[in-house]
Amino acid sequence: MNKLKVSALNLVPIREGQDDSDALNDMIDLAQHLEQVGYERYWIAEHHNAPNLVSSATALLVQHTLEHTKTIKVGSGGIMLPNHAPLIVAEQFGTMATLFPNRVDLGLGRAPGTDMMTASALRRDQHNGVYQFPDEVDQLQQYFGPANQQSYVRAYPAVNKQVPLYILGSSTDSAHVAARRGLPYVFAGHFAPQQMKEAIQIYKELFEPSEVLSEPYVIIGLNVIVADTDEEAEYLASSMAQVMVSITRGKMQPVQPPTDKLDQVLSLIHI
């Protein structure tokens, strides 16, 4: 049996009593710790107009993390492609791959990573980005490909860098995109587990071998609490419970400390 590879996704949250600078320092501290204990990769999300998250400039955070680590793979989990021109994404990640060879991952999502009003501000007059996602993935593959596959517009220094692409998703739509291109598939089971089994099944059934992969490759995002005892794990998980409840009630509060009085605390989170 192959050894299970474990990685981490960081939304770069702000904890209660901290500011954005503290959150960025924590991001680096966590990356360095996970590198020491043998994690495979460390990905950073993309979120906009979120006062409790500092992950709006994902490419900059990926580069900053690469600069402060030595061996762990670092990437986006992911770049929300409808918000960005594929050419610029290729130039940015091609540059990082030049500076840090064989350490850069590029996870790609098709959601805006924010509310619709903010998405409109990001995209300006480009409102069909979600529907263009498959074509834009193809563009990125071309930009990272060999010189003889390029068109007039080239994403230097991305040409022939072959930065690994990962298709992210929380529904079955993304499974089709990944399968038809023979790309790795990453399912967001940490917030959308309902369609996880179906999406992975579709991906495996429709998978077409490519120069990248000869067989399907799946990564699953899960919420995991690690502790020495079940009691301690439940205590630590109370922070996540407070986050989830605040989100469902339209709040964007910093991550709260653990509590052994969870029911009482949750009752104070008003709509």
Please identify what each model-predicted range represents.
Residues V6-A8, Y42-I44, V74-S76, V104-L108, ...:
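Hydrophobic faces of well-ordered beta-strands that scaffold small-molecule active sites
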Residues H48-S56, P82-L87, A192-K197, V226:
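Acidic-and-aromatic substrate-binding clefts and catalytic sites of carbohydrate-active enzymes
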Residues N2-D20, P82-G145, Y185, P193:
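Flexible, glycine-rich active-site loops centered on histidine and acidic residues
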Residues A23-M27, T58, V89, F133, ...:
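Aromatic/hydrophobic pocket-lining residues that form the small-molecule binding cavity
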Residues A179-F187, F191:
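A conserved active-site cap/scaffold subdomain adjacent to cofactor or substrate pockets
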Residues M1-T69, H270:
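N-terminal beta1-alpha1-beta2 module of alpha/beta enzyme domains
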Residues V62-K70, A97-R103, A179, S210-L213:
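Acidic (Asp/Glu)-rich catalytic clusters
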Residues N2, S120, Q126-R154, Q195-I269:
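An alpha-helical appendage that flanks or caps ligand/catalytic pockets
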